[in-house]
Amino acid sequence: MTVNKGISIRVNNVGDKVSYKENELLTNYTYHTNVVHTNSDKTQFEVTPLDKNYQFKVDLNKPERLGVMLVGLGGNNGSTMMAAVLANKHNVCFRTRDKEGLTEPNYYGSLTQSSTIKLGVDSKGKDVYVPFNSLVPMVNPNDFVVSGWDINGATMDQAMERASVLEVDLRNKLAPMMKDHKPLKSVYYPDFIAANQDERADNCLNVDPQTGKVTTTGKWEHLNHIRNDIRTFKQQNDLDKVIILWTANTERYVEILPGVNDTMENLLEAIKNDHTEIAPSTIFAAASILEHCPYINGSPQNTFVPGLIELAEKNDSLIAGDDFKSGQTKMKSVLAQFLVDAGIRPVSIASYNHLGNNDGYNLSSPQQFRSKEISKASVVDDIIESNPILYNDKLGNKIDHCIVIKYMHAVGDSKVAMDEYYSELMLGGHNRISIHNVCEDSLLATPLIIDLIVMTEFCSRVTYRNVDGQDGAEAKGDFENFYPVLSFLSYWLKAPLTKPGYQPINGLNKQRTALENFLRLLIGLPAIDELRFEERLK
């Protein structure tokens, strides 16, 4: 099956595990796990291996064009995203300040577009790698049709220029392609973002025509307005699928209130009653779910209240969140895991950031910063819990974790991150690791947006059924979609949303392994391991 630049992968000796029927891939897979029971003082462990049999079906027809609607289209991430798609689609080469000749456009930083996956070993035992997106058909970002909403009405060439993320030569070449694109009017409830954003809010759909001021009444009408925007965009561009992603300002946390947002019915009623704890992100998420369009939350606020998750469950609509994991936190999810897995005991992590883009400007408000602080702090929780030797009631079961974010206009999109990891070693020794990291914030976030959209679209084409006790070839029963919360996407998210009752996995290597093994099983390959018996056994 050829899915990437002429690459063809054929898996031999899979028997009846994998079959192709017209435009469908059917895979029979036995999932192996271990159920562990332990006594109260955790000195005795009883392990029971458990097998479950599933059949997966992949629709091999990826969309020729995929609709992408960004909330916050006119921001740094949104304008950079549109620019990246156009530059790659039209092969816009450009000059940079630090390189001779022309630079070709690329999708560096994107796991789906610029990374590889281990296929196996060759006859000499050497690892063989192929592009990540070559195992199964995935949509090409060049085929994205991009639109969206923003509370600021600047055209996209103006938004790109204001962001000043890209090289000047590239901006000049892309401006003619972007000047006719303007964000749709968005929802603006001032209480949810920093007051300093009011000066930008000139493109709002919730403006009272009599006073010319924004109003927070009529929230059900605002929801229906967004639903109509989605339908219109889909129809005008002849699209089969549209994915909505929030890359707008960080909102404050909403209160979880009984009778307001604790159930689907209460949430919808609260929207109709203009309840004060209904945020703009709630409006966009609910509209997307009701239109059966996947919705991804790229900011740290708690958009997915219990009522919204229930709404997604009832509508069988995919959702994912929260908060892009792009720089400092991604490194933290690797380094903290490494230290704890090595038997080293981190006792404090101090994380400092300053940045000068509008994200930093909005986060200078305490309520919005609190949302970000919660998101960034949770990344080490499951890592600590994985090692009761290092973290327990006697030694302490927490890490002192301090997070600081400051706005400094002068540095623009170049976010500066400084971290110090202070750890205990054997026999009273200590270790201190200090990291200074400077990066273009939006050029790290935009590839994540691309990956989230590509993988969400792919997951929407995968269904499964439980076939325990059945012959795979003669299996019966309806195929189902994934559970609506796409925890497979946790690799790209700071505070991964999970199925209620389950803990998130934050370790980056674990998250990547899950993605790789899922793609491998679909084409009949076993889960990857590093046993390497070819060299270790006689």
From Swiss-Prot:
Free-text function comment from the UniProt entry: Key enzyme in myo-inositol biosynthesis pathway that catalyzes the conversion of glucose 6-phosphate to 1-myo-inositol 1-phosphate in a NAD-dependent manner. Rate-limiting enzyme in the synthesis of all inositol-containing compounds.
Molecular function terms, GO-annotated: inositol-3-phosphate synthase activity
Protein name, as recorded: Inositol-3-phosphate synthase
Assembly and interaction partners: Homotetramer.
Enzyme Commission identifier(s): 5.5.1.4
Known cofactor(s): NAD(+)
Family: Belongs to the myo-inositol 1-phosphate synthase family.
Pathway field: Polyol metabolism; myo-inositol biosynthesis; myo-inositol from D-glucose 6-phosphate: step 1/2
Organism (species): Candida glabrata (strain ATCC 2001 / BCRC 20586 / JCM 3761 / NBRC 0622 / NRRL Y-65 / CBS 138) (Yeast)
Top-level taxon in the UniProt lineage: Eukaryota
Cellular component GO terms, alphabetical: cytoplasm
Ligand binding (NAD(+)): 74-77, 150, 186-187, 197-198, 200, 247-250, 298-299, 323, 326, 357-359, 372, 412-413, 441-442
InterPro entries, A to Z: Myo-inos-1-P_Synthase, Myo-inos-1-P_Synthase_GAPDH, NAD(P)-bd_dom_sf
Location in or out of the cell: Cytoplasm
Keywords (A to Z) from UniProt: Cytoplasm, Inositol biosynthesis, Isomerase, Lipid biosynthesis, Lipid metabolism, NAD, Phospholipid biosynthesis, Phospholipid metabolism
Reactions the enzyme catalyzes: D-glucose 6-phosphate = 1D-myo-inositol 3-phosphate
PANTHER family referenced in this protein's UniProt entry, alphabetically: MYO-INOSITOL-1 PHOSPHATE SYNTHASE (PTHR11510)
GO biological process, one term: inositol biosynthetic process
